[in-house]
Amino acid sequence: MKRNQKEWESVSKKGLMKPGGTSIVKAAGCMGCWASKSIAMTRVCALPHPAMRAI
């Protein structure tokens, strides 16, 4: 999973240079929360992801 998180980080950094980059960062952060199954962090995430509801 660490490999996937690095890929998400690179995507979020590229997204910061474009309009709407904040939403990409949020999505990457929420996926990171979901991947780590950190319940406290998933509650902080603003995007309702279908996979999040399963937790």
From Swiss-Prot:
Induction: By Spo0A and PhoP, during nutrient starvation, especially phosphate starvation. Repressed by AbrB during normal growth when nutrients are plentiful, in association with the transcriptional repressor Abh. It is found in: Secreted. Changing residue 33 to A/S: Cys-thioether cross-link not made. It comes from Bacillus subtilis (strain 168). Transmembrane segments: none annotated. Keywords: Antibiotic, Antimicrobial, Bacteriocin, Disulfide bond, Secreted, Thioether bond. It comes from the Bacteria. There is a cross-link at residues 30-55 (Cyclopeptide (Cys-Ile)). The lineage of its organism: Bacteria, Bacillati, Bacillota, Bacilli, Bacillales. The keyword Calcium does not apply. Produces a 26-residue extracellular sporulation killing factor (SKF) that induces the lysis of other B.subtilis cells that have not entered the sporulation pathway, providing a source of nutrients to support sporulation, and at the same time delaying commitment to the energetically expensive and irreversible onset of sporulation. Can also inhibit growth of other bacteria at high concentrations. Addition of SKF to solid cultures induces killing, but it is much less effective than SDP (AC O34344). This is Sporulation killing factor. Disruption phenotype: When the skfA-skfB-skfC-skfE-skfF-skfG-skfH operon is deleted, increased rate of spore formation; a double operon deletion (sdpA-sdpC plus skfA-skfH) makes spores even faster. In a single gene deletion no SKP is produced. InterPro entries: RiPP_SkfA (IPR030919). Residues 1-29 form a propeptide. The keyword Secreted applies. Disulfide bonds join 30-45. There is a cross-link at residues 33-41 (2-(S-cysteinyl)-methionine (Cys-Met)). Coiled coil: none annotated. This is a cyclic peptide. The first step in SKF maturation is probably thioether bond formation. Accelerated cannibalism by skf- cells is seen on solid media but not in liquid media. One of its GO terms (cellular component) is extracellular region. NCBIfam families: RiPP_SkfA. One of its GO terms (biological process) is killing of cells of another organism.
